[in-house]
Curated annotation (Swiss-Prot):
A Pfam family this chain is assigned to: F-box-like
UniProt protein name: F-box only protein 24
Residue segments, region Disordered: 506-526
The RCC repeat ranges on this chain: 386-435
Gene: Fbxo24
Keyword terms of this UniProt record: Ubl conjugation pathway
Species per Swiss-Prot/TrEMBL record: Mus musculus (Mouse)
GO cellular component: SCF ubiquitin ligase complex
Amino acid sequence: MVKRSCPSCGLEAGSEKKERGNPISVQLFPPELVEHIVSFLPVKDLVALGQTCHYFHEVCDAEGVWRRICRRLSPRIRDQSSGARPWKRAAILNYTKGLYFQAFGGRRRCLSKSVAPMLAHGYRRFLPTKDHVFILDYVGTLFFLKNALVSSTLGQIQWKRACRYVVLCRGAKDFASDPRCDTVYRKYLYVLATREQPAVVGTTGSRACDCVEVYLQSSGQRVFKMTFHHSMSFKQIVLVGQETQRALLLLTEEGKIYSLVVNETQLDQPRSYTVQLALRKVSRCLPHLRVTCMASNQSSTLYITGGTLIPRKQVPKAAELRAPDPPDQGGVYFEVHTPGVYRDLFGTLQAFDPLDHQMPLALSLPAKVLFCALGYNHLGLVDEFGRIFMQGNNRYGQLGTGDKMDRGEPTQVHYLQRPIALWCGLNHSLVLSQTSDFSKELLGCGCGAGGRLPGWPKGSASFVKLHIKVPLCACSLCSTRECLYMLSSHDIEQCPVYRDLPASRVGGSPEPSQGAGAPQDPGGTAQACEEYLSQIHSCPTLQDRMEKMKEIVGWMPLMAAQKDFFWEALDMLQRAAGGAGPDTSTPES
């Protein structure tokens, strides 16, 4: 193509070219117009644009932009009024929400995504049961995600997980089911909710009361309901015990623990009866402490404390004698109800009282605990510095310490820090962590039978990187016998912030009195290395030695990046040795 020009209009053309050479600044446009334009960008591009300069950072961070994006993502959402940045928070919650799962059995080993309810305002927590999955959003709506038979793209009928949804109830605060890892025991779903109660005689208007509603997980039918006095407000519910003696533990807004006992085998009978709500012993023995969260399993319960509930001088003398000086925040207390679990967790039965299962036992830790994970006979704790401590049964290597020795006190896993989430299963553990480039990875240890540690069918005594693609905004996880679930959500107001370890603790060894995080015995480490060398020497060929070395690297307590380096280096050496000739298969002297 040839561009022609007229000599008579050469001056005009030159001036037009000069005008085109002057750039027009975007700052000359009204801010409202720029905000309206950038609001049509995808969220990922909008965030990238906001990182280019100070001007676009202010434009892309405006609440008006995020309000338009939020209404585009969730047209049915109401006006937001809570929090410092309500529209930005709501938009990011709905943009990042997702439930992903990977089945352990079958030929397809890929990550799948469940159906996304349009009515859901972000995902706060989830719970898989025997047949379905339940999800709670940030406005208290509980969704019932059903498994169903659907037609595939090839016209075949196949069974899909969490492919249809219905609203189970609204006004929910929390929910729980049987705490065992096997979902076959989760027959009922207990929902803690707020309901408007009609006015009684002599009063005007209705009152909001907390209640516990029990639903059948198979059909979503409500079979039982118990209502509490309007003066009591709860925020968390957990279950403990067997079906015939199911204990419901309820945490109040003030940090008190109440409990009641129901018989699940009689819940489906249409009758009315009264249950007794009593103050749990941990709140009676430690009345000045405020419990912030609970975790439970079949035969144990764990409490993490917050700030003091009442001034120390107002604590009764009897309570002061029972608890002379407990920690005000981040302390951990245990209830263990069976001798077998007690022995697995603490290595002894010395302090176990079979007549008093509710007596709280304090765990000694060097720092405040932020969150925890509780399995059947082992547990994991994460402190304010991002350190991971494991305790309990280690028969399958589920503590990640590099060996299979039980731990009767919290022991630090030195090569893992600052996790996003922690999960303790029946005989394996999972850690969700973030790499330096902000991508997520899933690490696991323990028993690998049944595919529960993807890529490691033989299991591992130390945390290894699992062969699974983790969503970018994954925040929590759950593992069952059949499936691995990961919840994707990002809340800009609830990001965990770890403290930097003081300089006095960085290079030095922990105090002898702490016990938790004490370094392993050097003699034991040397003995293990000698055993590894003897195993390598017993291999008949060089290729077998390479494979054995890869296996040993997986056993050793190394960081994930270090293990990846050694595995890649061994693969390179193995490929190079494979083409060197027939003499490479002869073992060296």
